[in-house]
Each structure stands twice: as structure tokens, then as C-alpha cells.
Curated annotation (Swiss-Prot):
One of its GO terms (molecular function) is nucleotide binding. It is found in: Cytoplasm. InterPro entries: SurE (IPR030048), SurE-like_Pase/nucleotidase (IPR002828), SurE-like_sf (IPR036523). The keyword Lyase does not apply. Its cofactor is a divalent metal cation. It comes from Thermosipho africanus (strain TCF52B). One of its GO terms (cellular component) is cytoplasm. This is 5'-nucleotidase SurE. It catalyses: a ribonucleoside 5'-phosphate + H2O = a ribonucleoside + phosphate. The lineage of its organism: Bacteria, Thermotogati, Thermotogota, Thermotogae, Thermotogales. It comes from the Bacteria. A divalent metal cation binds at D8, D9, S39, N95. Its main location: cytoplasm. Belongs to the SurE nucleotidase family.
Amino acid sequence: MNILVTNDDGVTADGILCLARTLSKKYKVTVVAPETEQSAVGHAITLRLPLWLRKLDINENFEIYSVSGTPADCVKMGIDVVLGEKPDLLISGINRGNNLGTDVVYSGTVSGALEGAIAGVPSIAVSSYSFENPMYETAAKFILDFLEEFDVRSIPRFTALNINVPSVPYDQIKGWKLTRQSKRMYDDYFEKRVDPSGGNYYWMMGTIIEDDPDPKADYKAIAENYVSVTPISVFLTNEEYLKRLEERYEDKTIR
């Protein structure tokens, strides 16, 4: 199986190298990732600037390329320029820190996987829960084992798996659960600070809000030392609300 690997933490980040080294023991791996950190860039693509592609001279048993762009740029270039064909699987990660609830909207890691899904490639985003103490070896071993069990060819086009792995030793992982994207979000605020020259600047702060009653909420699996596996879609239409609107309103014609 040929696997294209990307991320948003940067091409030399510990998470992506750990994942690529682990996967390359069994699969053909090609890494195409941002040359600098692109965390929380969402699904941005580069339209008004050139993109630079460089092959890195690193002593690994896989090829590794940097792109002067976003994770979505990397996936596009990885498929069209580096490989010249679709890989069998795309994996984005391992992210430093979780991508749960509304994180998915902002995440470059998740967007890398969704870009693969748009291209018709079975795609997975994988994150290690703790930002302060990520355990990449646990997440990488889980993915290697997961690929033995899960038929990635069953993932429909325009769908990706968002996988979050508890940051604990592998022998403490209880298993994996199919979950839903939760309503986990942040209570954000901006702290006003003063720079050395006396000017004001702002730093975004916030606390996590976890009050989703759904027992299948993604973060609840993590709290019990289960890996959270959530199928997510490129499409954002609120089907339930659309149906209610259709029951109330007819199509309107402007005269």
C-alpha cells in the first residue's frame, strides 16, 4: 500500500516523523508536508503566491518533501506533482494536541485529510491528545494496528476519519470507539498586553467547554482511554434544519 503523509506541524515535526518511520516498516511512505508550522490554518490554499517544493536530504527509508504552503497545498502537490497519481491512503498527522469538537473547523491537520477526501483518496487525520505531553509512539502504533483491522477502502469519497489517540502508554489504550464530532468548544477571550516599546497587543486565551450530552461525543471516549474514531464530511449542510425550512417555506421567486 502506498501512503501519502502530511501534517500541519511542519515537515520535521516529531509527530510526522514518528508516524512515517512506523508506517514505513510495512508500507511505502512518501511525506509531503509544510516547510513551517501551519497549525490552525484550516483548509486554506495558496492562490496568489508561488509554491516551492523541495526534497529533503534525510537519512530515512522514505522520501520527504517540504512545500512552502498549507496542508491542503501539500496534499494537492503530493498527489499531482510528487506522486503523479493517487496514493492508496492519505494520513495527516500525528498532530501535537487533539482535534475534537469545534477544533475540526480550524485544524490544518483535519483539513489535510479532508483535502485527500475531496481528491477521492481514503484519508485519515490522527492527533495525539496532549499538547504538553504528546505520545506519538502510542498514536503511531495504534494507526499501524488499525490499518490491519480497518478496511480503508470502505471510506466514502468526501469523507475522512478523524482519529484522536489518548496520550498514554500503548498498553493503557482500551480499544477504539466510533464517535461523533462533539459540541466541545472554547470560551475565548483576548488578553491585552504591552510590548517593550509601550504598544498594545492582544493574545487569545480561553478555556475548554465540554458539556455535550451525547454519550458518543468524541472527547468522552478519550476520557476513558479509548481512541476516538469519527467519520467527518466535507459537506456542511445542516440537513435537519434544511428539512424544517422546506416544510415552512416554499422556494421564493424575486419579481
